[in-house]
Amino acid sequence: MEVNQKWNWDTKPILVKCGGFSSQLAKNVTEKVDGDPLWGSRFDATNPEAVIQTHLDFLRNGADIILTNTYQSSVEGFVKYLGVTRERGVELIQKSVQLAKQAKEQYLSEIGSEAESALPLIMGSIGPYGAYLHDGSEYTGNYADKMSKEELRAWHKTRIEICLAAGVDGLALETLPCLMEAEAVTELVLDNFPDAKFWVSLQCMDEKHMASGENFAEAALSLWRLVQSRKAENRLLGIGLNCVNPLFVTPLLSSLTKVAGSDRIPLVVYSNRGEIYDVEQGDWTGTGEEVVKFVPEWIQLGVRIVGGCCRVYPTDVLAIRKYVDGLNIKP
């Protein structure tokens, strides 16, 4: 499994990722999405047309990358919250990949592009164990104190295997709140899936620290060293941040480039708007930022995949698309 060879960094050095899938999905369904124990994943089963429509909303606004609707998907979660069999749980994760593929196929047909086009890429969304727990712990990582790396690897392996077998272009290991889980899932991909392309994205609570309180720059650098130790730099699409306040991103990335020295670590960023998620209410509070206004400084720092996370909509992605296109970066 490789990213289609018709695309490479030389031909398109900055890629625009979609925005917040479940945020946009909420506009395409009548039921409440935030606060659901399966979040958007439920709709792969109950409203696949809305899932395809949500992918298309981002593709039609310039996204080079879409993520499967699997952030909060797990076989265990589907068994627990949908009351289905394990076999059906596996099928629903496979279906999520197929829905993304259907959206890509429809979009390419709309723009008159060949069906085998490399872009847009479809990345398998691999969210943290805390998302399955449905208790807000993906914003603390406190479960790392109660679990071993081996347990976390075993839990992540099933979904990764299913996504890769279903034909994603790569894996988005995302919203990881603590270094132990980030290392566990990165090691799993490096050692068990030798052809898989991937990025690793950490969740941070301020300008210096991951959700767990660990230093972001040190954690990200240790992940980079891990990739280097396996000589897997060519498989890494980026290391970075997501589901984070955009105001924190530049200080966080600057701290990483400082400790990285002469190493040029490929960077990925897709922030929220800056509102706060209230776990008790299952909703967002506060006012947000226009993500596009931060993009110039992020690109200056070496970001090569940029987009949005929660509450970042297709109109925001279009604004990012227009800015990136306006740079007119020559290969």
UniProtKB/Swiss-Prot annotation:
InterPro entries: Betaine-hCys_S-MeTrfase_BHMT (IPR017226), HCY_dom (IPR003726), HCY_dom_sf (IPR036589), Hcy_S-methyltransferase (IPR051486)
Example GO biological process: methionine biosynthetic process
Sample GO molecular function, one term: betaine-homocysteine S-methyltransferase activity
Catalysis: reaction(s): L-homocysteine + glycine betaine = N,N-dimethylglycine + L-methionine
Domain Hcy-binding: 3-324
Record NCBIfam families: PRK09485.1
UniProt-recorded name of the protein: Betaine-homocysteine S-methyltransferase
Source species: Drosophila melanogaster
Taxonomy of the source species: Eukaryota, Metazoa, Ecdysozoa, Arthropoda, Hexapoda
